Structures are given as structure tokens and as C-alpha cells.
Amino acid sequence: VVGGRVAQPNSWPWQISLQYKSGSSYYHTCGGSLIRQGWVMTAAHCVDSARTWRVVLGEHNLNTNEGKEQIMTVNSVFIHSGWNSDDVAGGYDIALLRLNTQASLNSAVQLAALPPSNQILPNNNPCYITGWGKTSTGGPLSDSLKQAWLPSVDHATCSSSGWWGSTVKTTMVCAGGGANSGCNGDSGGPLNCQVNGSYYVHGVTSFVSSSGCNASKKPTVFTRVSAYISWMNGIM
């Protein structure tokens, strides 16, 4: 996350760290959201290579054991059949991970609330992106979970020339466009949007501009969760 600040520990209790095995260690690569006790929602581009994965729930500082973590292995990966790794702008950047064990819910580990099917946010809806991604373009990952204020940008604005143009589809959500943004390592994580006083995960972090994570008029682009509710229900 570029901009924003370090989150209060465990204040986004559905946020997970998706990690891959290399040698004898695991490394953070993407975020995700716990949506059932045995299921995580993330981005397709995070899991479209064959690796050994694990999911860490209740995490805050990636390098410190704070006692709230639950570490889960991944039983199976379900990538949307429409996903094409050569065309992230084509959409369908969503995947479900079936965990080998059920999460125990507590103050640090909670299920994300998902929006009703096909709900569209108005322009400038209050949202936060959360993640351990890079804190500047080409910079280091954040040890601690960060959050940044990222108000939604409606499709008409986001798809206009000078913004993202035709790269952005109606199955995506844009948010930000100013100094704050997602960045590499935030992918798959949530866009947490406030609707009627509660937070719902309206987006799965998908891509940013190649000219910089927080390039002007290039808001962070998310898979629109409300477009895939029936797809997810058909798998879980």
C-alpha cells in the first residue's frame, strides 16, 4: 500500500496473507479475504502458477509471531475459467482457495461480509485498501499490515480517456486515483467499503498502472466482487 498508515493490529480480521514455499521458508506474495471458515477469496493471478501455498490468518507483522496467527495449508485452488494470465485487463481475476482446516473465529479472525449480487458502488464511496504490499513503486513490502483511504471511482469516470479508458471493464471496481494506492504484494486482498455503516469487501485487488502504483488518474483496479457472487456460491 502506497500512502495511508499501519493498521491497528487485527482491525481487518478477514485479511489473510497468502504465502508460497521456497526452500524451507514461506514468503508473502498476495493478500486475500476469509469468506467462509474453510474458504479464502483472492486474485487468480496470485495462484495461477503451481506452488505450495499456505494462508496465515490473524496476521499483523509478517516477521513476528504475535500469538493470534492461524496457519492453514491450501487443499485446492479454484481459478475462474474466464481468467487468462496473458490478459489481466480481460477480467475474471478471482480465485477461491479451499483450506485444509476450518478457521477458528475470534477477535482477530472473522469472516468478510460480501455485497449483494451485482451491487454497484456510487462514485466516492468510502473504502479502504489493506495489505502488506510495497509502500512505494519498486520499494519494499510492508512488515505490518497497512490501510489507505481509497474512495471508489465510478465506471464512467474510470473508463474515460485520460483515466483507464477501455482497460477497465464493468466487472471491475476502481478506487483512488490520487497519492494513495495498492501496489505489488497487495493483489488478491480486499477493498473494504463502507455501506450503511458496515464494511463489505467490494473488490479483490487486481492491477495498477505500469507507470507507477499511484500514477495520477490511474486508480487501483479491483475485481468487482458483486459480479461473482453466484460463481462463488456455485463452488463453495
From Swiss-Prot:
It catalyses: Hydrolysis of proteins, including elastin. Preferential cleavage: Ala-|-Xaa. GO terms for cellular component: extracellular space. Residues 1-236 form the Peptidase S1 domain. Its EC number is 3.4.21.36. It is found in: Secreted. It comes from the Eukaryota. InterPro entries: Peptidase_S1_Elastase_sf, Peptidase_S1_PA, Peptidase_S1_PA_chymotrypsin, Peptidase_S1A, Trypsin_dom, TRYPSIN_HIS, TRYPSIN_SER. Pancreas. It holds the Pfam family Trypsin. Keywords: Calcium, Disulfide bond, Hydrolase, Metal-binding, Protease, Secreted, Serine protease. Acts upon elastin. This is Elastase-1. It comes from Salmo salar.
